[in-house]
Amino acid sequence: MSGRRERTKAANRAAILAAALQVFAELGYGATSVRDIVRRTDLASGTFYNYFPDKDAVFRALVEATGDEARRRVRSARRSARTAEEFVESGYRAFFAFIVEDPARFAFMRSNLETIRDRFGDAVLPAGTEELAEDLRAAIAAGHLAPVDVEYCAHAMVAVGLELGARLAERTPPDVDGATEFATGLFLGALERHALTVR
């Protein structure tokens, strides 16, 4: 009985998240109500509150899940890099490709960029920046990157990725190759100039 109950709980939570993804994409965060989300499910209206206290909580859950998966893919791509170019290019390409690959997630992000950045950035930014800093230190130690100020570099690379990702989401069609090439060229140039100044 316990196993069935857990499966039901997991299915209900997944149904709420899937419905919320669609509604937030269509209406945007500000115009969406809990009632709008529940209407897209087969659940009773009170069931929502067994899983989330309000729309903020379900929105945050979507942002966190998206951020977790994006970080996993980006980090996996970066760790296979053996040169500075591979390190920068692979991370940005993995991130930009992730943004556009799922139409529902892409629509959600496209409709809620400002809300994600302004109200829920704390759900994803610190962890992503710290992971990038760790990977930068490892790449420097392995000789794949010249020594840099890791804190500055990590924050700058994350900021550029987020801003270009936002612009990517606004373009039709989204240009993953163009965004990747621009970000890679920008940081390779900066890394090369920095390497020359510290020699």
Protein language model regions, located:
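Basic, helix-initiating cap at the start of DNA-binding domains
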Residues: 1-27, 31-43, 57
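C-terminal peripheral helix-coil segments that are non-catalytic and often amphipathic
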Residues: 3, 97-101, 130-141, 158-160, ...
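Short hydrophobic/aromatic patch on the recognition helix
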Residues: 41-52
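Alpha-helical DNA-contacting segments of helix-turn-helix folds
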Residues: 52, 59-66, 109
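A secondary-structure capping/hinge motif
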Residues: 56-58, 104
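Hydrophobic alpha-helical connector segments
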Residues: 61, 72-101, 157, 180
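Amphipathic alpha-helical packing segments from all-alpha helical-bundle domains
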Residues: 68-71, 117-142, 151-155, 178
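Short linear capping/connector segments at secondary-structure termini
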Residues: 75-77, 109-116
